[in-house]
Amino acid sequence: MSTFGENITIADLERDPYPIYATLREYEPVSWVPSVNCWLVTRAKDVEIVTTKTELFTAQAPDSPVDRSFGGPTLMTMDGKEHLELRRALDAKFRPRIVASYIDELVRPIALEWLDRLLTQESRTAELITEYFEPISVLSLGSILGIGNLTAERLQDWFHGLAMGATNFEGDPAKAAENDRVAADIEFELRPRMQRMQDSPDNSTISSLLNHGCPVGQGRTIDYVLPSIKVI
């Protein structure tokens, strides 16, 4: 007799995953799902155990589309010392107390600008996710990363292309091609910037990931850091 998890399809998850998660939480809180080649853990207490007992559970997922999409191991798929070192490199910008000190000044002007754009549209209608919330999100994060000069349209294109690749469990060639197009554009834009940051560090998050905790002139390589930048 097959389990509920064995009968879950990618199409089911893409259509509406939340009823599926609810069923798993009630009947199969730890379930092997062949369609995505991984275990789904859906109860909060179990999730806490999996994410904190690093001596028992690994974040590495070499057979998932995640590492392929982002171009290598990332913060999400690293364990131990590697993960800790990159996390520490992010602390200067992303500790809750630090975020609280700058988030309003950073986000409010962006939110107001994009609200004004919506209000000047003749139709007075909008798709709020793509035309308001996503631009605010990507532009705010882009500023923190050190790429605040890039347009919302380009950053949204990166976001959607990488997400498409990271969830391409079915190995769809069209999704892989779209991911690769976006990855190439990111490489084209970021690699020269990162080379400059290696020579002349600044206070951006990207620079911190390259240089934090490293001896002068011996920072992390671009190839090592870039996958985690894509995740962020």
Model-derived segments and spans:
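Active-site substrate-recognition loop segments, prototypically the cytochrome P450 B′-helix/B-C loop
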Residues: 1-129, 138-156, 160-181
